Regions:
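Non-catalytic DNA-recognition/assembly elements of restriction-modification systems
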Residues: 1-19, 23-39, 132-194
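A short beta-sheet element
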Residues: 44-105
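A common structural junction motif
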Residues: 108-111
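A short glycine-rich beta-alpha junction/loop motif
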Residues: 79-86, 116-138
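Structural beta-strand/beta-sheet cores of well-ordered domains, especially the beta-sheet scaffolds
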Residues: 16, 28-33, 58-60, 84, ...
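Short, recurring structural edge motifs at helix starts
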Residues: 18-22, 113-116, 128-129
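A generic structural motif
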Residues: 114-120, 150-154
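Intrinsically disordered, charged low-complexity linkers and terminal tails
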Residues: 82, 90-92, 96, 129, ...
């Protein structure tokens, strides 16, 4: 399999390095991405900061340290980041399926790091991932359904769906489901604002 380094596919930047505890939170604000491995790394929503532009939607965030080092997510809305979160901007246009595939590839390198030991801040851009030509065909043919019409997925229904997907389709489906659930939540919040 042909591989290349992350830096040859993405522009790697260090994010905003903000402290969530010092931000003014609001339910309908800008997503705040930390090193969390849950909810696409989003720990809350904050008011826009006048002199700091949020990152645009569609970029990948990567946790550079902590227990879930290299947790990687495609952000469906604009966002700010905490410390130790990298932001990856594709150097060429990529589909959401390709971005999710690279999130999976990045996260799969977690074993190279230890929580609160070796962190990824210096080495992320040198991680080897498959070239775009090596992406399996099923990735580009995967359909990501539009769940924006669903108001709320109950916890039990969500758990059953996750169990089914984990057993039948594997980890990539889980990543896609996580992203879709987050997008649905954010779309509903945006509808409330408008």
């Amino acid at each position: 399999m042909k591989t290349m380094q992350i830096k040859d596919l993405f522009q790697v930047t260090s994010g905003n390095k903000l402290d969530f505890g010092k931000m003014a939170t609001t339910e309908n604000g800008v997503a705040f991405v930390s090193r969390s491995s849950r909810n696409n790394g989003v720990v809350g929503y904050i008011e826009k900061i006048g002199n700091v532009s949020p990152f645009e939607s569609g970029l990948i965030t990567v946790s550079l340290g902590g227990t879930y080092v290299l947790s990687s997510f495609v952000q469906p809305t604009e966002f700010y980041t905490a410390q130790n979160v990298a932001v990856l901007r594709p150097l060429v246009e990529m589909s959401i399926q390709e971005k999710l595939f690279y999130c999976m590839c990045i996260s799969a390198n977690r074993f190279r790091y230890s929580a609160f030991g070796r962190e990824a801040n210096r080495t992320l851009k040198y991680l080897e991932v498959p070239t775009r030509e090596e992406i399996p065909e099923w990735v580009s043919s995967a359909t990501i359904p539009d769940y924006s019409h669903i108001k709320k997925v109950t916890h039990s229904a969500n758990s059953i769906l996750i169990q089914f997907l984990m057993g039948s389709l594997g980890f990539v489906s889980y990543l896609i489901l996580n992203t879709l659930n987050l997008w649905c939540t954010r779309i509903q919040r945006l509808k409330k604002v408008v």
